[in-house]
Swiss-Prot record:
Disulfide bonds join C128-C144, C154-C170, C191-C250. It is found in: Apical cell membrane; Basolateral cell membrane; Melanosome. GO terms for cellular component: apical plasma membrane; basolateral plasma membrane; melanosome; sodium:potassium-exchanging ATPase complex. This is Sodium/potassium-transporting ATPase subunit beta-3. Residues 57-279 are extracellular. The lineage of its organism: Eukaryota, Metazoa, Chordata, Craniata, Vertebrata. Glycans are attached at N240.
Length: 279
């Protein structure tokens, strides 16, 4: 049969069958059982070696890491500020005083978050000395009490609605945790209203003080039970104010080694949020 001639269907099937298995040479897909065994053994050894090399490399790298303290911390010299409860819209709290469902989620989140700040939950925590860094050498690291009574009108004790039902909402401001951070001076969180004619801002504890006794922080695994110091911000709109909308800006002040300005990070040591209270 010449090259130009087409093979019949039976001849093509016969050649495929012969390729799949040749009874004369006992070859399967062009290879004998010995050949298949050798090539499978080669790939088994080859990929087994790669897997072992990868496993050893990962193991060697993990030996250089500490499971309790991050190895590289020099890129986070100063903490940022966060607000709580988390707004539905980015950094904007909008609610209606006459509609409890509009702020129900905020109240629920605040109660859940502040549960660990109740005195009953802090029985095993230390009553630390005010105004002094609480440095420890381990291996057991104690945590200081932060009673919710420090938040006064925003503690949820006297007003379970945290002021939302009266149009005087409370927002919690907290510093991000940084392991080993030792603030200098007398750190505090100052909060101001961008429009003083519209609303008045109150902070709790008084003057937004962040006590040094809550520093340094030793990490989640070592510092079991640690409570972040909080500052509560309460906004009160004037009775004659027709505009129930204000922007509040909070900054870390009073400490040389805590920055509150950075062109590349607008949350470094500061945060701004907007509150809109409808009738």
């Amino acid at each position: 049969m010449t090259k130009s001639e087409k093979k019949s269907l039976n001849e093509s099937l016969a050649q495929w069958k012969l390729f799949l298995y040749n009874p004369t040479t006992r070859e399967f897909l062009g290879r004998t059982a010995k050949s298949w065994g050798l090539i499978l053994l080669f790939y088994l050894v080859f990929y087994g070696f790669l897997a072992a090399l990868f496993t050893f490399t990962m193991w060697a790298m993990l030996q250089t890491l500490n499971d309790e303290i991050p190895k590289y911390r020099d890129q986070i010299p100063s903490p940022g500020l966060m607000v709580f409860p988390k707004p539905v819209t980015a950094l904007e709290y909008t609610f209606s005083v006459s509609d409890p469902s509009s702020y129900e989620g905020y109240i629920k989140d605040l109660k859940k978050f502040l549960k660990s700040y109740s005195l009953d939950e802090q029985k095993n925590l230390n009553k630390c000395t005010d105004g002094v860094l609480f440095e420890q050498t381990g291996p057991v690291y104690a945590a200081c009490q932060f009673p919710d009574s420090l938040l006064e009108a925003c503690s949820g004790t006297d007003d379970p609605d945290f002021g939302y039902s009266q149009g005087q909402p409370c927002v919690l401001v907290k510093m991000n945790r940084i392991i080993g951070l030792k603030p200098e001076g007398s750190p505090r969180i100052d909060c101001i209203s961008k429009d003083e004619n519209t609303a008045m801002v109150s902070t709790y504890p008084n003057q937004g003080v962040i006590d040094l006794k809550y520093f340094p922080y030793y990490g989640k695994k070592l510092h079991v039970g640690y409570l972040q110091p909080l500052v509560a911000v309460q906004v009160s709109f004037g009775s004659n104010s027709t505009k129930k909308e204000v922007t509040v800006e909070c900054k870390i002040e009073g400490s040389k080694n805590l920055r509150n300005e950075d062109d590349r990070d607008k949350f470094l040591g500061r945060v701004a949020f907007k509150i809109t209270a409808r009738a």
